[in-house]
Swiss-Prot record:
Pathway: Isoprenoid biosynthesis; isopentenyl diphosphate biosynthesis via DXP pathway; isopentenyl diphosphate from 1-deoxy-D-xylulose 5-phosphate: step 4/6. PROSITE patterns: ISPF. This is 2-C-methyl-D-erythritol 2,4-cyclodiphosphate synthase. The gene is ispF. It comes from Shewanella oneidensis (strain ATCC 700550 / JCM 31522 / CIP 106686 / LMG 19005 / NCIMB 14063 / MR-1). The record marks 36, 135 as: Transition state stabilizer. PANTHER family: 2-C-METHYL-D-ERYTHRITOL 2,4-CYCLODIPHOSPHATE SYNTHASE, CHLOROPLASTIC. Binds 1 divalent metal cation per subunit.
């Protein structure tokens, strides 16, 4: 069996008058995230982790923010594309661990929905997907509620 590990990180600031979408789930909040796509910072970090595990660059290479085709793009579509690239090389998800770093909004009420969406998009067992959230104790840009940061680690395996 061959395994590959990928790490993804992404940050977006608050400020768009649109829904806040995280893991494909609408999370009630006063503002959305600034981005060329739909701004789903979680799915961007996961996509980067998958691409990194496969040595395929990053989402900026595959979906440049200078390309009008990706303006307002659904990040679930982007994630599924990245995962399809891994699957085409014979790899499948072993597990996924995500950390959402945000002072606000509270993520706990939405975590299970997020896991379900990820399991569906990655054709995986929800038991292989972990999503957790933490704050920075009011320190830094996330602590000042200026934006959200996300780290994702993915294990892909090929039999």
């Amino acid at each position: 069996m061959k395994i590959r590990i990928g790490h993804g990180f992404d940050v977006h600031k608050f400020g768009e008058p649109r829904p806040l979408i995280l893991c494909g789930v609408e999370v009630p909040y006063e503002t959305g995230l600034v981005a060329h796509s739909d701004g789903d910072v979680v799915l961007h970090a996961i996509s980067d982790a998958i691409l990194g595990a496969m040595a395929l660059g990053d989402i900026g290479k595959h979906f440049p923010d200078t390309d009008a085709a990706y303006k307002g793009a659904d990040s679930r579509v982007l994630l599924r594309h990245c995962y399809a690239l891994a699957k085409a090389k014979g790899f499948e998800l072993g597990n996924l661990d995500v950390t959402i770093i945000a002072q606000a909004p509270k993520m706990a009420p939405h975590i299970e929905d997020m896991r379900q969406v990820l399991a569906a998009d990655l054709n995986a067992d929800v038991a292989d997907i972990n999503v957790k959230a933490t704050t920075t104790e009011k320190l830094g840009f996330t602590g000042r509620k200026e934006g959200i940061a996300v780290e994702a680690v993915v294990l892909l395996s090929r039999q």
